[in-house]
């Protein structure tokens, strides 16, 4: 164990202090100091210090080497990353040039690239737009032009049926080249683009900058004519330098130093601004503007780096190439096909249906009759008051004659019979009601036929409208593609599109400009055209706006030249006018339906009145029969009473006659007595019994008038009795006288 331990210690000493001791001993031997131990100790202390210094040196050197190595690695990585970023940017920019999409989608893609690959706080793009033409305004001094006609032309007065629009002036022939200039025609120099009236319409913006889409950048208004000398005009916005000075790129390191920079929210900020014009390579015409900024607080407020500015420029160039390709494809699509033949067939079919509908409408509602003539479809005259019944008049005349006869008899001293009650005139409404029902039945039948014809006219007009919708829908894809690929506004088509959108009930603010109308170019447009209820009652305020739009449209030839592949402008205008025709026929049909309903209601009322009149007549006849029976019974009783009264009167008359005869006899006797010398007392005694006998005779009842033959014996009996009484009285008077 001991040797092993000793060897281990030796190894330990050799590894730790062996080299230092050996070198120290060698130094002591070489120096031969007086005190070798002290020398060795000092040398070892110095050796330790030197070792520390050397260690620090090598350690620092190693650290420096490591830092340099790290820096080199980082620089290499940064260079590689920069190369990768540059390659990625280049690939992204080059890829944009190959994108096949709509212009707005290309602008949105460019904005996303700028925002993604640069330090810009915001990016946005605008199209170079033309001002839209104003709508048509009705002249104040021409009332006829302000009135809507049946089938008026788009740009002016109405065309008569079968009338063709006036031919457009032929283009002037080009001047022939002068001698010596050669046979080849001189190349046409393109006319420079006039940007003086154009403005920037922003259509794409990065996230958080959506408010930019509601803004448009216009040129300032010209100074007023009565402006003072101190008037300071509004400066032209800085971005218009791209158009006016033909500058492909603008850059402002600090927008606070440039007064011409306009802020969307009217609040000044700090930061940089860059704008690149997007021009078509072939023509050099600026079609759009791509811009980016670092405005604080959305951005850093610092200037854009050179790499960022270069990338924005590269994106604008790629966008130019992509837009040119899109415009070329759109132009090819416009010229590749033509819907002229289909539209002509549609016009012929619609004209035929319109002619049939017009015939049905004319039959349903004929024109008003001339003055003095009687119309067929007029309402029946008012029901006249029915005349009194003839029987009632005859009874009334008989009653009046009887009354007159009674009055004449009363003049002779006899008591006149009582006047019969005057019978009321009874009107019979049944004949008048029957005549009215006959007229109303004829009117209802005529109204039914007119309503059926009006419905047929509406159906024919709707069929024509469906034909127009079918043609428009069959070209919907091509139409939408053409509309969405147009950067410049097609003025004529835009007027018709506005009229169509007004008609379909879209908010007016949503298509006040061509930029805003872009949101309506979707399949829903044609779905709404097919679903529109043309028979509903028209809102004339809306139709006034519709008319102001489509009357501003140009002639058909110019309108068709804007979209020759589908002729959407002409088809949409035909749709609007056909909707108006359907609406007008629907108004006629509703009027005739109302007349039919009224005629049917009047007929039902008259029929009900006839039933009621017949019921009242039956009740009245029953009542009259009852009253007649009662009157007949009363008349019979009255006749019987009259007969009795007549008999009594005759008896009274006979008694009176007898009394008179007795009186005469008494007078004769008195005269005879006077002659014989008898006094007046004897005559009075003879007259008293005669008056006593005549008094009861006056109270006797007279026999009936009809039984005068039967009463004659009684009269004779009374005469005989009176004569016997006279004889007896004379005998008594004689006895008294004796």
From Swiss-Prot:
Keywords, ordered alphabetically: Calmodulin-binding, Cell projection, Cilium, Cytoplasm, Cytoskeleton, Flagellum, Methylation
Cell location: Cytoplasm, Cytoskeleton, Flagellum axoneme
InterPro entries named among the record's database cross-references: Dpy-30_motif, Sdc1/DPY30
GO cellular component: cytoplasm; cytoskeleton; motile cilium; Set1C/COMPASS complex
Keyword Zinc (UniProt): no
Region spans: Disordered: 134-189, 357-426, 674-738
Gene Ontology molecular function, alphabetical: calmodulin binding
Bias type Acidic residues, positions: 134-153, 161-182, 371-415
Classification via CDD domains: DD_CrRSP2-like
Disruption-associated phenotype: Absence of radial spokes.
Record's comment on post-translational modification: Asymmetrically dimethylated at Arg-104, Arg-260, Arg-453, Arg-538 and Arg-615 during flagellum resorption. Probably methylated by PRMT1.
Biological function: Flagellar radial spokes contribute to the regulation of dynein arm activity and thus the pattern of flagellar bending. They consist of a thin stalk, which is attached to the a subfiber of the outer doublet microtubule, and a bulbous head, which is attached to the stalk and appears to interact with the projections from the central pair of microtubules. Binds calmodulin in a calcium-dependent manner.
Family: Belongs to the dpy-30 family.
Record's miscellaneous remark: In-gel analysis assays show kinase-like activity in vitro. However, such activity has not been confirmed using recombinant protein.
The protein's name in its UniProt record: Flagellar radial spoke protein 2
């Amino acid at each position: 164990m001991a040797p092993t331990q000793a060897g281990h210690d030796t190894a330990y000493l050799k590894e730790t202090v062996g080299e230092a001791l050996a070198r120290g001993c060698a130094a002591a031997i070489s120096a031969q100091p007086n005190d070798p131990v002290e020398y060795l100790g000092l040398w070892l202390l110095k050796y330790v210090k030197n070792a520390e210094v050397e260690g620090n040196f090598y350690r620092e050197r190693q650290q420096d080497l490591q830092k340099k190595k790290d820096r080199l690695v980082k620089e290499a990585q940064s260079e590689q990353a920069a190369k990768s970023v540059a390659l990625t940017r280049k690939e992204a920019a080059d890829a944009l040039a190959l994108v096949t999409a709509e212009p707005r989608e290309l602008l949105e893609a460019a904005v996303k690239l700028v925002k993604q690959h640069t330090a810009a706080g915001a990016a946005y793009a605008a199209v170079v737009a033309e001002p839209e033409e104003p709508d048509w305004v009705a002249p104040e001094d021409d009332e006829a032009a302000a009135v809507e006609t049946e089938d008026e032309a788009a740009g002016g007065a109405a065309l008569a049926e079968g009338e063709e629009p006036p031919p457009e002036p032929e283009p002037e022939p080009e001047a022939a080249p002068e001698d010596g200039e050669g046979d080849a025609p001189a190349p046409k120099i393109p006319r420079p683009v006039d940007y003086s009236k154009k403005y920037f319409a922003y259509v794409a913006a990065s996230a958080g900058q959506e408010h930019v889409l509601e803004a448009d950048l216009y040129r300032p208004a010209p100074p007023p004519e009565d402006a003072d000398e101190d008037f300071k005009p509004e400066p032209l916005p800085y971005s218009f330098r791209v158009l006016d000075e033909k500058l492909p790129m603008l850059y402002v390191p600090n927008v606070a130093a440039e007064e011409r920079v306009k802020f969307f929210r009217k609040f000044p900020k700090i930061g940089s601004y860059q704008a690149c014009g997007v021009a078509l390579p072939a023509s050099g015409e600026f079609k759009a503007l791509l811009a980016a900024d670092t405005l604080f607080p959305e951005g850093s407020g610092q200037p854009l780096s050179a790499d960022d500015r270069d990338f924005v420029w590269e994106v604008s160039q790629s966008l130019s190439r992509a837009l040119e390709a899109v415009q070329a494809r759109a132009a090819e699509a416009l010229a590749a096909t033509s819907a002229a033949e289909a539209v002509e067939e549609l016009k012929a079919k619609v004209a035929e249906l319109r002619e049939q509908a017009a015939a049905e409408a004319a039959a349903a509602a004929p024109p008003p009759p001339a003055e003095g003539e009687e119309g067929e479809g007029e309402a029946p005259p008012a029901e006249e008051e029915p005349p009194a019944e003839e029987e009632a008049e005859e009874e009334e005349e008989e009653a009046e004659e009887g009354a007159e006869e009674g009055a004449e008899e009363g003049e002779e001293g006899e008591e006149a019979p009582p006047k019969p009650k005057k019978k009321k005139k009874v009107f019979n409404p049944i004949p008048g009601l029957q005549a009215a029902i006959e007229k109303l039945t004829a009117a209802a039948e005529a109204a039914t036929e007119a309503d059926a014809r009006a419905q047929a006219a509406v159906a024919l007009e709707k069929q024509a409208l469906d034909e127009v919708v079918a043609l428009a829908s069959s070209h919907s894809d091509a139409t939408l593609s053409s509309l969405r690929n147009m950067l410049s506004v097609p003025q004529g088509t835009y007027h018709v599109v506005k009229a169509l959108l007004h008609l379909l009930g879209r908010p007016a603010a949503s298509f006040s400009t061509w930029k805003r109308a872009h949101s309506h170019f979707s399949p829903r447009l044609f779905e709404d055209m097919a679903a529109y209820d043309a028979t509903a009652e028209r809102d004339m305020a809306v139709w006034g706006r519709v008319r102001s739009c489509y009357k501003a449209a140009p002639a058909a030839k110019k309108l068709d030249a804007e979209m020759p592949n589908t002729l959407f402008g002409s088809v949409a205008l035909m749709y609007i006018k056909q909707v108006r025709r359907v609406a007008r026929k629907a108004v006629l049909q509703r009027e005739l339906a109302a007349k039919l309903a009224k005629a049917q209601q009047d007929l039902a009322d008259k029929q009900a009145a006839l039933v009621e009149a017949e019921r009242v007549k039956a009740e009245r006849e029953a009542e009259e029969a009852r009253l007649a029976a009662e009157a007949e019974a009363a008349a019979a009783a009255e006749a019987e009473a009259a007969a009795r009264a007549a008999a009594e009167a005759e008896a009274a008359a006979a008694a009176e006659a007898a009394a008179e005869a007795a009186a005469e006899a008494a007078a004769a006797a008195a005269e005879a007595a006077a002659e014989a010398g008898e006094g007046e007392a004897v005559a009075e005694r003879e007259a008293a019994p005669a008056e006593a006998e005549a008094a009861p005779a006056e109270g006797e009842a007279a026999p009936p008038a009809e039984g005068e033959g039967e009463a004659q014996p009684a009269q004779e009996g009374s005469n005989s009795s009176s004569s016997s009484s006279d004889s007896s009285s004379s005998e008594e008077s004689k006895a008294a006288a004796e």
